[in-house]
Amino acid sequence: MFTSAHANRSAQASAPAGHYAHRSGEQNTNGLISEIVYREDQPMMTQLLLLPLLQQLGQQSRWQLWLTPQQKLSREWVQSAGLPLSKVMQISQLSPSHTIDSMIRALRTGNYSVVICWLAEELTADEHERLVNAAQVGSAMGFIMRPVRNQGTLGRQLSGLKIHSNLYH
């Protein structure tokens, strides 16, 4: 089973980017969307949990796209974290409404192994479904980084994994 999944991924990676749009009806389990709720006062959790995965994805021939709110990624941090500087792309200063649409378009292309974005609000069911479909079409991973709100408005976040991001400055 591992061999067939690997062969399937290799065939998809060699297909032109436009090819993925024609396969949208095909069931593909290689895509993943995950919301990561983090506390800004605990930076090591993100680095311990997320960096090994990003380092592994950095070995693929595809890019890593970072959709950051306002800050630019530090070149020094990218290199010291063991991420391939030549495969990391960043788009900053997107409004939240454009961030989700940009993430969907990027995931769908198949050009990125992972797309990471920061959002202040939870995804709607429709947004989550659109992101999952795009990730499956492009065989990509998408991570939505969301900071924990004040204690009075935590809601369902209490049972979630809280991961901080100190990845940009």
Curated annotation (Swiss-Prot):
Residues 162-169 are annotated as: Lon protease binding. Disulfide bonds: none annotated. The keyword Cell division applies. The record marks 169 as: Essential for degradation by Lon protease. Residues 106-112 are annotated as: FtsZ binding. Induction: By DNA damage, as part of the SOS response. Is rapidly cleaved and degraded by the Lon protease once DNA damage is repaired. It comes from the Bacteria. InterPro entries: Cell_div_suppressor_SulA, P-loop_NTPase, SulA_CellDiv_inhibitor, SulA_enterobact. Residues 1-26 are annotated as: Disordered. Residues 1-13 have a biased composition (Polar residues). The keyword Cell division applies. Keywords: Cell cycle, Cell division, DNA damage, Septation, SOS response. GO terms for biological process: division septum assembly; DNA repair; negative regulation of cell division; SOS response. Interacts with FtsZ. HAMAP family: SulA. Component of the SOS system and an inhibitor of cell division. Accumulation of SulA causes rapid cessation of cell division and the appearance of long, non-septate filaments. In the presence of GTP, binds a polymerization-competent form of FtsZ in a 1:1 ratio, thus inhibiting FtsZ polymerization and therefore preventing it from participating in the assembly of the Z ring. This mechanism prevents the premature segregation of damaged DNA to daughter cells during cell division. Belongs to the SulA family. This is Cell division inhibitor SulA. The gene is sulA.
